[in-house]
């Protein structure tokens, strides 16, 4: 075999090994991505089904909310947050907040309200809804967009918001 033939043979073998290694790496990474995506999906599903009580919501997100007594809320993604596509995922949020009496009074006075019930309340939140509410509605446009509803009789605030 000539010197040139040996060089071509070595180059061919090396190229084949590199191509095989790359194909194996791509397969391995794709397999791990599927596992990560499945883990992400199960975490999102668990989050969606768990009524949250964390004090995530403040004056910054819902002006006039004050130092509320308690809160129960849910978040649901508008699209697949586990997708490998670039870009953020918008989230929908709903929740009930029991306001302090002085905060409920101040909030009612600070905004223009109209009588209107919420269009939809997610079933998992229904246990936290007041009995026989007299809902008043107004819009907010902060980091979150949507509507808030106030039942002045109980000082309960219901929010239905989307970020993004």
Go through each PLM region and give its residues:
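Short, internal acidic amphipathic alpha-helical interface segments
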Residues: 132-139
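N-terminal export/targeting and maturation segments
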Residues: 22-90
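N-terminal Sec-pathway targeting helices
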Residues: 1-18, 22-26
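Short, exposed beta-strand-loop hairpins at the edges of beta-sheets
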Residues: 139-153, 158-162
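Mature extracytoplasmic domains of secretory-pathway proteins
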Residues: 63-132
